[in-house]
């Protein structure tokens, strides 16, 4: 069966809120094996919403609505669906009692306006809202299905999981199983070129590349009724890809680079220290956002000025004078200084020009050097990033974490 998502709310069209509901529902429908070919966003207008319903029903079997189930006059999803299907809205005492109980539990009397939410489409399946006042509904009409869900994600998602997932599972025997490989240090076009035979000659599993900020994701997907069979197919394809590009793969699915780095440090019993200039503490922030980071993160230095680099890290004034703060030499001395003045096994450093000012003819905005030091090894790497100040800082911090990842592998 084919589904369509219809998100209702003028605030979505005005860009006042981000439509996370559509993203969530798209992912869940895919995992359930329900085909989704269209998404529609409609403002709070009865006639336009009915028009969207008319178009959707000509091409889809299941319509999933989010939003427009509130108590105010601009909440018109129930009204539009019922008018289109020729259904009446009937006051349901049980629903009304639950809404009144919701307010009583919070020590306030239910506003009269909320009584509107107790009117339900005749013949519908009522979906209880355990996190708000707007119930959801499933309406079956002449082989078509309309599923009405509240707009707030913290209400919509639990309702979908508890009631809609079991309902939809009966329509698809097969599910889509996916695995995402996460790459860093290589571009989308380079990945496609090196995997061209796999990508273009492969139908099961399917492969799809997605460029993300400073990294690339490759989704491997297969549609199967047996999870074990699906896992075997995904495993085999992952092995083929790792044989070709394994050095660039840092994680899978929802893993972040910092999570992977912290886990690797834990596994090897290592500690890290960080000396930052152009990234201004962003690397330390990323690492310490990971639970358990206290076991592997020793300390961080934010040495923005040349004076701080000299005083805190022992960078040579002569090196600064001869090569400048943004240089291989300073990056290496920063990393060595962070290692020497800490209890770490590995130290990394950043120095660069985040812009928009500070560039010279030989040192443009986006030039960053990342240093790394262990007791037996010191090196630095040059990167050239583009974008505004925040984008360059983010790119540099990810590149530094990747340098750290590779150093841990070879430690």
From Swiss-Prot:
**Pfam annotation, one family:** CinA_KH
Give disulfide pairs as residue numbers.
none
> What InterPro entries does this protein map onto?
CinA (IPR050101), CinA-like_C (IPR036653), CinA_C (IPR008136), CinA_KH (IPR041424), Competence-induced_CinA (IPR008135), MoaB/Mog-like_dom_sf (IPR036425), MoaB/Mog_dom (IPR001453)
**Family of the protein in this entry:** Belongs to the CinA family.
Q: Which PANTHER family match?
A: NICOTINAMIDE-NUCLEOTIDE AMIDOHYDROLASE PNCC, NMN AMIDOHYDROLASE-LIKE PROTEIN YFAY
What HAMAP family does the record point to? CinA_B (MF_00226_B)
Q: What is this protein called?
A: Putative competence-damage inducible protein
Q: What is the lineage of its organism?
A: Bacteria, Bacillati, Bacillota, Bacillota incertae sedis, Caldicellulosiruptorales
Gene name, per UniProt, is cinA
